[in-house]
């Protein structure tokens, strides 16, 4: 199964009129992706409560929406993101308790409506995750997280990500086309198309194919990570400034790349192999994200859902002057 890259849809929540807009937007997204009236109603309910809680306890924030492509059915991801002081999660899981101290259905009820529910909250803010799938589909959740945003919400994004699954194996791609806008997107999409044809090929040969596909475009930076779930190994190949990290509960290590421009010039493409990575998080990110973050500065975050981790990193470390992509994969669960 292949999953092609797409942007995160962002809805500002700054006044009560935007709650209804969030509900309608989420419900339509669900209906357009095969949810029946009952399941789409669950999506609408969750979007309403999450947007309401953002407004009540934080004053302002965002909902991030994403389609979750699946082999049996698509899902809908809703993330509520804010920068307010954290709240008492245990109290908020009680039915009828709102994070704003007013009457609400409670996050406990939200968690029952969603197939996947997770949260990270501290003094820097809160990220709440709800993933919903059609109840009849019994779709399995993929332990991956994506946060991708274009500069100034431009429809064109020079960053591209792509994931391929083959049983217990995974191959992940991130490309950052030089600059931003339509020409950067054209360069990155050309590389993505070549990658999608043979995502599990030898990375040296795969990179050559991508380089040829991107020749004549602006070119860009690239990283490919290939995970073997049976052996518990990761092979990482990078050209340019796509960041990569392997993170466990108590340590992290950066993944090495070579200088150059794919579609332009680079000297070599040596893959680097990493053993015993089952149970680790793989994080790949474009240079729209600052590199000075440390996941262990956020107690407990390493144990949260990858989608929560991606949203926290984007919230706190986005540079704000380029397209940005954050891809997080829990490697032990990389199954299609």
Give a label for each model feature.
Residues 1-2, 10-13, 208-213, 218, ...:
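C-terminal catalytic subdomain
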Residues 85, 177-185, 288-293:
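Short acidic, Gly/Ser-rich segments with clustered Asp/Glu that frequently serve as metal-coordination loops
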Residues 1-8, 51-140, 164-173, 204, ...:
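Conserved beta-strand-loop-beta-strand hairpin that lines the nucleotide-binding pocket
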Residues 133-178, 183, 187-193, 265-267, ...:
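N-terminal entry segment of metal-dependent catalytic domains or homologous docking segments
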Residues 37-64, 209:
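Conserved ATP-binding N-box helix of the HATPase_c
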Residues 1-45, 145-164, 336:
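Bergerat-fold GHKL ATPase/HATPase_c domain
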Residues 141-158, 207-215, 240-273, 277, ...:
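PP2C/PPM family metal-dependent serine/threonine protein phosphatase catalytic domain
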């Amino acid at each position: 199964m292949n999953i092609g890259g797409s942007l995160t849809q962002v809805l500002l929540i700054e006044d009560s009129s935007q709650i209804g807009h969030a509900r309608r937007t989420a419900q339509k997204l669900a209906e357009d992706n095969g949810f029946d009236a009952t399941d789409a109603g669950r999506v609408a309910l969750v979007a309403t409560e999450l947007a309401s809680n953002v407004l009540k306890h934080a004053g302002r924030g965002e909902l991030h929406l994403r389609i979750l492509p699946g082999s049996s059915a698509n899902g809908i991801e809703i993330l509520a993101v804010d920068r307010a002081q954290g709240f008492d999660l245990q109290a908020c899981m009680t039915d009828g308790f709102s994070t704003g101290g007013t009457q609400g259905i409670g996050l406990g009820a939200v968690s029952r409506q969603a197939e996947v529910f997770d949260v990270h909250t501290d003094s820097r803010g809160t990220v709440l995750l709800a993933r919903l799938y059609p109840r009849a589909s019994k779709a399995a959740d993929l332990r991956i997280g994506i946060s991708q945003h274009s500069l100034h919400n431009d429809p064109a994004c020079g960053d591209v990500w792509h994931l391929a699954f083959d049983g217990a194996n995974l191959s992940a791609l991130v490309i950052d086309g030089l600059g931003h806008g339509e020409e950067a997107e054209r360069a990155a999409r050309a590389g993505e198309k070549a990658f999608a044809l043979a995502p599990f090929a030898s990375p040296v040969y795969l990179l050559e194919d991508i380089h040829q596909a991107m020749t004549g475009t602006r070119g860009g930076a690239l990283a490919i990570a290939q995970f073997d779930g049976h052996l518990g190994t990761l092979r990482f190949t990078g050209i340019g400034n796509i960041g990569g990290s392997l993170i466990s509960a108590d340590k992290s290590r950066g993944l090495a790349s070579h200088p150059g421009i794919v579609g332009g010039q680079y000297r070599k493409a040596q893959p680097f192999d990493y053993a015993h990575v089952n149970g680790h998080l793989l994080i790949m990110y474009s240079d729209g994200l600052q590199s000075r973050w440390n996941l262990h500065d956020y107690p407990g975050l390493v144990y949260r859902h990858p989608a929560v981790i991606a949203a926290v990193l984007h919230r706190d470390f986005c540079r704000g002057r380029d397209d940005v992509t954050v891809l997080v994969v829990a490697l032990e669960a990389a199954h299609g």
